[in-house]
C-alpha cells in the first residue's frame, strides 16, 4: 500500500505578505514558513507522513499543489498582467487540474518507499512577462538558485520531474491569445 495526498504550496510561506522567498525557484528544500492554520496543518501532515513511514514502511507521497486551475479559468489571466503584485503571493504559480490528476497517478505508481513531498505546478507562470523580470521587479533581493527559462515557473518542479516522471501537459498559453 501507499498514501498519496494533497499538501500545498502554502507550506513554503505563501502568500508572501510577511516575508520573501529565501530563493527562487523555490524547491522542496526551501525553508517552511506556514503563515496560516491551513498551511501549518499541511506541514504537520508532512511530518506525520515521515514518522508513519518510519514506523510502518508505508510510502507517503505529498503533493504540494500550486493554485489549481481549470481551462475556463484561463480567461481571467490577462486581468493579472497589468500589475505583477496581484499574483505575487504565490510567485505567479498555477497548475492545470488535468496535470494534478497526472501527478496523483504518478504518485500512486512511483517506485518510492520513503516519505517524499513534491511541488506540483505548471511549467510556466500565469504572467506574459519573463519570470526573471517579475522576480527582479517584485522581489529584487531574492537570489536565483538556478538559471530559468523565459516564462519558467518559480515553483521548481525538478524533483517531481526526476522522481515521478511528472511532465505538465497543459498551459494557459494553449487557450489564451497573446
Language-model regions, residue ranges each:
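Catalytic tyrosine of NAD(P)H-dependent dehydrogenase/reductases that use a Tyr as the general acid/base
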Residues: 23, 38, 92
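Short aromatic/basic micro-patch
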Residues: 62, 94, 154-155
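Conserved Rossmann-fold NAD(P)-dependent oxidoreductase catalytic core, especially the SDR/UDP-sugar
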Residues: 1-35
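Alpha-helical substrate-binding/gating segment
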Residues: 68-117
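C-terminal substrate-binding subdomain of Rossmann-fold SDR/epimerase-dehydratase oxidoreductases
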Residues: 98-178
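Conserved beta-loop-beta element that borders a ligand/cofactor-binding pocket
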Residues: 7, 46-71
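Active-site helix of classical SDR
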Residues: 37, 41-44
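Short, flexible, mixed-charge acidic loops at enzyme active sites
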Residues: 16-24, 74-82, 133-136
Amino acid at each position: 500500500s501507499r498514501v498519496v495526498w494533497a499538501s500545498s504550496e502554502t507550506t513554503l510561506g505563501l502568500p508572501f505578505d510577511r516575508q520573501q522567498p529565501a530563493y527562487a525557484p523555490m524547491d522542496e528544500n526551501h525553508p517552511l514558513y506556514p503563515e496560516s492554520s491551513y498551511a501549518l496543518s499541511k506541514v504537520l501532515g508532512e511530518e506525520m507522513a515521515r514518522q508513519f513511514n518510519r514506523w510502518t514502511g508505508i510510502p507517503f507521497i505529498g503533493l504540494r499543489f500550486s493554485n489549481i486551475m481549470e481551462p475556463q479559468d484561463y480567461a481571467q489571466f490577462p486581468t493579472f498582467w497589468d500589475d505583477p503584485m496581484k499574483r505575487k503571493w504565490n510567485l505567479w504559480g498555477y497548475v492545470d487540474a488535468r496535470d494534478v490528476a497526472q501527478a496523483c497517478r504518478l504518485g500512486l505508481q512511483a517506485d518510492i518507499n520513503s516519505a517524499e513531498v513534491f511541488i506540483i505546478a505548471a511549467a510556466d507562470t500565469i504572467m506574459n512577462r519573463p519570470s526573471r523580470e517579475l522576480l527582479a521587479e517584485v522581489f529584487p533581493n531574492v537570489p536565483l538558485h538556478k538559471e530559468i527559462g523565459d516564462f519558467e515557473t518559480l515553483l521548481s518542479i525538478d524533483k517531481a520531474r526526476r522522481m515521478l516522471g511528472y511532465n505538465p501537459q497543459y498551459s494557459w498559453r494553449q487557450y489564451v491569445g497573446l
